[in-house]
Amino acid sequence: MLNKNLNLAVVFFLTTTSLFVACKKDDNTTTPTVSEAEFKNRSITPAFIKMGSEFSNVGIHTLVSSEDLIPNSGTMVYGGAPDGQGFIKNPDGSGYIMVTNHENTWAISRLYLDKKLNITKGDYIVNTDGGMFRLCSGTMATPEIHGFGPLFLSTGESNVNAMTHAIDPVGAANPSIQTRVKPALGKFSGENAVPLTKVAYAGKTVIILGEDSGNGQVYLYVSNTVGDLDNGKLYVLRRVDQNQIETNMTWNNNYNVEFVEVPNAKNLTGPEMENLNASLKSIQFARVEDLDYRKGSAANNREIYFVATGVSGSTEKTYMGRMYQLKLDANDPLKGVLKIVADGDVSPTGTNVKGTDIINPDNVCVTENFVYIQEDGDSFFPEATHNSLIWQYDIKTGTKKVFMDMTHKDAAFLGSKYNPAGANQNKFGIWEHGAMEDISDVIGVPGTFTINIHSHTWTDGDKFLNPSKAVSVQTYKSGGQTLLITKVPR
């Protein structure tokens, strides 16, 4: 989740190597930087994705899957359900470090890559014992962008007292430690903790968080000391008119909102925080999943997009899911304007679009001009007419296109070890998208992203069980995949 600052790319193809030359503009000077990145299939596993018809020029390159041998790492298994991810330069100058949440095994892996993007070794910096909770989306804070770090923020789910881990991506691996959580960021079943950039609110650290619960909140952590994750205050989002019902917000309307303090949040339990919702009049969303801010200017960085994935059986909540835009006040992060920008239930003109539009949006990746909305359709709502997709939402026009699809129902995969015969084999949404991460500015190649796939039907006995070698074992034993995609519009 990086700021766009690559202005020119000249590409040379030398035999099988792709050499990229990029120029960064800094104070009216240009400093050429050369990327040695090579884009090719590195995994023994075929790609689990395919591009939408309007994006056939996007390159797909497998990076790693659960059945690959990780070099110089013994019997390490890259776990299934790869989700939130961070990608940084290795401080020793040898290449890159990629850290990944493995949602259903409650662990965080770390892979080292050379400058060509070949994986050279790996380990687990958080195992199931240290993870304590399901770990979904995540955000890498860096000094260049956020003013502190590097620090990987991984918010726990699946427990009302879950918290956000703050993990050093370059330090020694102490995977079982349980003391890296940050109580000041609140206790709730969460999805992500996203720090805004250092220019969004100079001199402050502002972090937006989402609660993945049937009565889900949007929280904001604010500290007047950059990088302080222990002594700031926590706030919760509400409408100024204090209407808490999600479906009372409708298309083509702007809603004035504010963040109200959660008193003594650092010392509250999760149930105590939840019990405050009635008195604080916070908006009750249908499971707030991922959040991200718009890249580019400081004003852009105060423009946030988040998704409510939807629940069944409640007229007060979205069913198929929504995406919201939240614009924060330039001078006060506690004030803003909220509106609907995508809705899986009804179109802006009132047409029923259940099952044909977005279905259970789970992750978002926001660039300067687009929002990439990743779906998790494994609630198997009966109206569904498509697989879990990634949609490209155009911020300027408000229109959406299908960016990416899954391959699990293609002839080559049906009946294979990746999607064997079974009750769910032909269901829409049986596979889901994990995080999509913009790594363009890290490697110096514009339009380069990682994308993670939860291939839930792919099991191989117990080969993928307990990949982090923890004492406590989660029963999940499906494989997963991470890919590199290139020439992605930003």
Language model features: what each stretch is:
Residues 1-10:
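Bacterial N-terminal signal peptides that target proteins for export
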Residues 16:
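Short, surface-exposed linear motifs at loops/turns and structural transition points
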Residues 24-490:
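Sequence/structural signature of beta-propeller domains
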